[in-house]
């Protein structure tokens, strides 16, 4: 990736049990600040769930953040997963067809 003047880019392998933000939601919760000492204008580009681990991109490049995160940009993302228990052909077929995840707060 070509670095624009004044922009910083970092990659971090987020461990299981660490929240993908710099401040904890509850006292004692592990967060990025426990692992990284970056400028205050650097933020994760996306997120990984608390109970997942993987590569996390961080930057202060707002154009990059918009390009990756805005749904209308249709950025293709690939995830690898590990499942516990039985994972049959029906479940595999459903995942290959695509799964709609409804988010309600």
PLM regions: where:
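RNA pseudouridine synthases
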Residues: 1-105
